């Protein structure tokens, strides 16, 4: 098996840049770009297979096939990406879901084991209720990966993902932050990665609870929390109840999950959106289920959102999922957030209309400062979580942190 080498470890972290038309369906297209930009997939291979994916079943078979081919050709980095993301469109009850999640992650930790064996990246498991939250911890590096001798970090960052994340996907962003002088604790919480897929712990909207567990375990204070995607709601939520968080980066506009869900399935602000919201509020379970079923039959993104949502949030049907999502919001606790906050949006986000930022700005009345940065397609960063230009995004986040810390002096 191909192994990562010491020479590879001392190279500076680099990011790919660009967005490609790989599939006519917006969510398949985005996830294929994510596969290339973040996960290590080969662009030329994906360009060939992308147009042949029309259903979730196509996605599964094509990506497993690509993973098998990559393994046969000893292209382990590509195989990790294909196996890991093959699981993405597998649904609850599919025995291959856990199988390929574990296959991809086991390959990941074997392929990059030198990072861990050398001590450059430390792993820990934080007790949380009946499970353990996995954490990767890295201290600041000088350029090319040599750890600084006793140098104080520019800041301590608590980093996590969102609704469908695997924290291994943020491995190289974590290293990039460390390479630039930051100490980083990257963790998975309930509903994410192996905490849900292997340990069986599903989401909680009370994100301050897993965050408290991590802060307590490592005795952290005065940290910056960065939450990606749904983390754009979860991280501010945690900050509302946790004074040890001094700065908040919401790496997605995310005022209210129910509104985001209905925007994606019914269209933002449309008659159908308003009707669906009213039906949910009136507890019209059978009608809501019918509406979502009809939508899911025609739209693979709605199908994925619904199936993943029922699985991740332990809902028995569409109504249960959609109604539960009203608890996943920041608007009802926004007045408790008093820290500096940066909200990051994208002008072509296929999940979240960037116009939703107004709700957040109006609700965050007591923050110390509020910065909003809208990335655009002209910067190759207009898609969800700006995955087409990660370097630009992380450089922006780091600069903001340093500005906020400088203002505190």
PLM regions with names:
Residues 169, 200-220:
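Alpha/beta-hydrolase active-site loop
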Residues 163-175:
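The serine-hydrolase catalytic nucleophile loop
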């Amino acid at each position: 098996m191909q192994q990562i080498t010491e020479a590879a470890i001392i190279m500076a972290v680099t990011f790919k840049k660009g967005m490609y038309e790989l599939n006519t369906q917006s969510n398949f297209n985005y996830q294929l770009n994510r596969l290339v930009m973040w996960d290590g997939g080969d662009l030329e291979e994906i360009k060939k297979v992308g147009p042949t994916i029309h259903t979730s079943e196509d996605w599964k078979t094509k990506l497993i096939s690509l993973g098998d081919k990559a393994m046969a050709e000893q292209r382990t980095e590509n195989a990790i990406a294909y196996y890991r993301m093959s699981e993405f469109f597998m649904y609850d009850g599919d025995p291959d879901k856990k199988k390929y999640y574990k296959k991809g992650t086991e390959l990941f930790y074997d392929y990059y084991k030198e990072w861990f064996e050398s001590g450059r990246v430390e792993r820990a498991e934080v007790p949380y209720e009946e499970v353990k939250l996995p954490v990767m911890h890295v201290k600041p590096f000088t350029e090319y990966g040599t750890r600084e001798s006793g140098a104080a970090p520019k800041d301590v960052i608590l980093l996590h993902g969102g609704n469908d994340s695997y924290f291994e996907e943020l491995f190289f962003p974590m290293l990039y932050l460390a390479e630039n002088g930051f100490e980083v604790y990257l963790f998975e919480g309930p509903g994410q990665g192996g905490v849900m897929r292997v340990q069986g712990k599903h989401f909680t909207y009370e994100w301050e609870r897993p965050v408290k567990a991590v802060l307590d375990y490592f005795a952290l204070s005065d940290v910056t929390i960065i939450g990606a995607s749904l983390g754009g709601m979860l991280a501010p939520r945690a900050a509302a109840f946790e004074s040890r968080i001094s700065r908040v980066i919401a790496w997605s506009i995310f005022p209210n999950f129910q509104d985001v869900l209905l925007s994606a399935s019914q269209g933002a602000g449309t008659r159908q959106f308003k009707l669906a919201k009213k039906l949910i509020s009136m507890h019209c379970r059978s009608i809501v289920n019918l509406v979502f079923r009809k939508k899911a039959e025609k739209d693979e993104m709605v199908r994925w959102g619904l199936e993943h949502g029922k699985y991740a949030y332990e809902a028995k049907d569409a109504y249960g999922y959609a109604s539960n999502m009203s608890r996943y919001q920041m608007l009802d606790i926004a007045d408790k957030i008093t820290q500096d906050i940066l909200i990051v949006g994208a002008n072509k986000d296929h999940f979240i209309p960037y116009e939703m930022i107004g709700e957040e700005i109006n609700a965050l009345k007591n923050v110390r400062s509020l910065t909003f940065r809208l990335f655009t397609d002209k910067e190759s960063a207009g898609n969800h979580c700006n995955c087409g230009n990660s370097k630009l995004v992380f450089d922006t986040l780091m600069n903001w942190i340093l500005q906020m810390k400088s203002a505190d002096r």
